[in-house]
């Protein structure tokens, strides 16, 4: 088993929104981990697979057929508990089949000891919180398994087993993040009582099965690239401008890729290009994978929006929103007429994604600055009364209006650049997040988003080379 603690793994992802395999320095120590280099700076449901670390017990049928004298249901052995022995036998059979080697076992012990100690192997109690530790572990596992996977081909059997086994272990934490909901229980004597039963927390109950399904679909997508009509040149055997086919002929190959990405493998196609069937299949796979990418990105954005804003971020906000966005943008936003964010973005002439991220940071900071000033200007103290700022009478407050316009501008900016990397606030939320469930969902959705984006980029490379070859005929 490869060690998860590998900050030098390469990703192939051209958008900083997702994990970038194109940058050799992508997997580095996140700013929110003060104890370990095995982490990553970035910028998204009930488990279908029963974890080997926890046995899920259904308590809905855990009552006897007869009521007690006090009419309280008497707990007896449930149906699911009767199945535990069978599940344990199946689990033991799986263990026998897998036969984890001694080095792998020692690596897992070390890794989970690291999780327990918060990445502080000295045991001095100075480690990061559990949420950050698990987030880093999932990110590092992704880098270990997919870091060197830079082409459209099935994942190696060993890496697939590593990914599935360790993700099941990391996701098993969610089995214990539950909430209680009321449920009516019908007794044998006809009486109905209301009992409380546990189920996974709402966000986990909804999102985790969806993420597992997306994970499975991405694995199937990679498995489908067998016996393809395209292939890859050996790394270092050709430049970005020429390639040599298996027949010994030379032809010009131009890939849609920055010149500094020289270490990435170059896709090759036959001299006449791909067949119509192969080209159609590639386009269909690209479309389906792109939908997976959008779904993972939506889940990630949703989880991030639910995370609490750290106090450390609020303390760094400027006292004036105007100083954050700049004079020209502020002048346009503070106009008395109707605000058109799309026109403002057109006037800014954003030429790169880096500029877009900087603008998003500034607009987001100004938005929270104006919101804070709007709340402070209100004399009401309780939160329920502060929410009355939504009333019509208070919509005339200048700070409130500016905060609304900043939010609209930020929304339009993210719509125009859907693969925009995470803002400073998002990174700060991940850094100071202490909710283990949200940390699992955020990191899991983020790595799936990165993998989906990479697959789409690799397919685009093949289609571009195919188009170039057909155009040169």
UniProtKB/Swiss-Prot annotation:
All copies of domain PRONE, residue ranges: 95-473
Residue span of region Disordered: 1-28
Keyword vocabulary terms for this entry: Guanine-nucleotide releasing factor
One matching Pfam family: PRONE
Keyword Nucleotide-binding recorded: no
Domain of life, source organism: Eukaryota
Entry GO MF terms: guanyl-nucleotide exchange factor activity
Ranges of Polar residues composition bias in the record: 16-28
UniProt comment concerning the protein's domains: The PRONE (plant-specific Rop nucleotide exchanger) domain is responsible for the GEF activity.
Function field: Guanine-nucleotide exchange factor (GEF) that acts as an activator of Rop (Rho of plants) GTPases by promoting the exchange of GDP for GTP.
PANTHER family: ROP GUANINE NUCLEOTIDE EXCHANGE FACTOR 1, ROP GUANINE NUCLEOTIDE EXCHANGE FACTOR 2-RELATED
Protein name: Rop guanine nucleotide exchange factor 3
């Amino acid at each position: 088993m490869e060690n998860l603690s590998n900050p030098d793994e390469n990703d192939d992802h051209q958008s900083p929104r997702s994990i970038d395999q194109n940058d050799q320095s992508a997997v580095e120590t996140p700013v929110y981990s003060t104890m370990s280099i095995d982490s990553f700076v970035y910028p998204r449901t009930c488990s279908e697979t029963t974890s080997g670390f926890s046995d899920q017990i259904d308590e809905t049928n855990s009552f006897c057929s007869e009521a007690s004298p006090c009419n309280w249901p008497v707990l007896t052995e449930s149906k699911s508990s009767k199945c535990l022995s069978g599940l344990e036998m199946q689990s033991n059979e799986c263990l026998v089949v897998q036969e984890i080697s001694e080095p792998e076992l020692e690596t897992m012990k070390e890794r989970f000891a690291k999780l327990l100690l918060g990445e502080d192997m000295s045991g001095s109690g100075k480690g990061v919180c559990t949420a950050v530790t698990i987030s880093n572990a999932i990110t590092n596992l992704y880098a270990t398994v997919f870091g060197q996977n830079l082409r459209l081909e099935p994942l190696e059997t060993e890496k697939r087993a590593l990914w599935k086994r360790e993700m099941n272990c990391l996701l098993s934490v969610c089995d214990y993040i539950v909430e209680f909901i009321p449920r009516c229980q019908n007794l044998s004597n006809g009486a109905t009582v209301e009992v409380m039963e546990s189920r996974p927390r709402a966000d986990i109950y909804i999102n985790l099965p969806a993420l597992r399904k997306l994970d499975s679909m991405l694995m199937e997508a990679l498995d489908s690239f067998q016996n393809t009509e395209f292939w890859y040149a050996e790394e270092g055997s050709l430049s970005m401008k020429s390639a040599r086919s298996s027949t010994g002929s030379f032809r010009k190959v131009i890939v849609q890729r920055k010149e500094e990405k020289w270490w990435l493998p170059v896709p090759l196609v036959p001299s006449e290009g791909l067949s119509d069937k192969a080209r159609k299949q590639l386009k269909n796979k690209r479309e389906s994978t792109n939908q997976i990418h959008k779904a993972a990105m939506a889940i990630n954005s949703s989880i991030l929006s639910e995370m609490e804003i750290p106090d450390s971020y609020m303390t760094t906000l400027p006292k004036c929103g105007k100083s954050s966005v700049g004079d020209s943008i502020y002048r346009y936003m503070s106009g008395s007429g109707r605000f058109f964010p799309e026109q403002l973005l057109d006037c800014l002439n954003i030429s790169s994604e880096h500029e877009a991220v900087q603008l998003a940071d500034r607009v987001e900071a100004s938005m929270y600055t104006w919101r804070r000033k709007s709340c402070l200007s209100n004399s009401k103290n309780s939160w329920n009364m502060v929410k009355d700022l939504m009333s019509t009478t208070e919509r005339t407050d200048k700070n409130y209006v500016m905060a609304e316009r900043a939010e609209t501008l930020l929304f339009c900016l993210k719509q125009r650049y859907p693969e925009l990397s995470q803002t400073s606030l998002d990174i700060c939320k991940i850094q100071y997040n202490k909710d283990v469930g949200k940390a699992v969902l955020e990191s899991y959705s983020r790595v799936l988003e990165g993998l989906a984006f990479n697959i789409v980029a690799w397919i685009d490379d093949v289609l571009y080379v195919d188009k170039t070859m057909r155009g040169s005929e």
